[in-house]
Amino acid sequence: MNARDLLATALLLSLLGCATTPVPTSTARDVPRTRVLNATLLERKEGLGQVVVKRDEGLAASACNSRVFANGTPVAEIAPGEKVTFYLPEGEQMLAAMATGICIGGLVEAKASVSRSRPAVFRISYGSSGEFSIQPTAF
């Protein structure tokens, strides 16, 4: 192994060890309309609860978007530092996220308890070992 190969390997390993950082909901940017895949879910309607899904910031997978699903229906593709706000019926709902492009991650899911009284807030993140996840957050 020559010095160039060693440097490339070290760089790759250092990137894999970078965890992403939560973004406060108040500072996360709204996903652009061009990446909204189902605009009807973004409409606030009587009897529905608010769901916010945001994508962490950080070096890990920063070149890729994440596709957000609600009960199997695509909602939007969000980039790091962005959020999508949509509305679902009250009760247990399934959210999912899938890494797009060249990024690893596959499809991950989480149950959301949706209520009209408070938003259900979730984050999409990469851990320090490269694991891709969607989970509830207080940030």
Regions found by a protein language model. Give the residues of each.
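Short loop/turn and low-complexity linker motifs enriched in small/turn-promoting residues
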Residues: C18-F139
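Sec-dependent bacterial lipoprotein signal peptides
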Residues: M1-A19
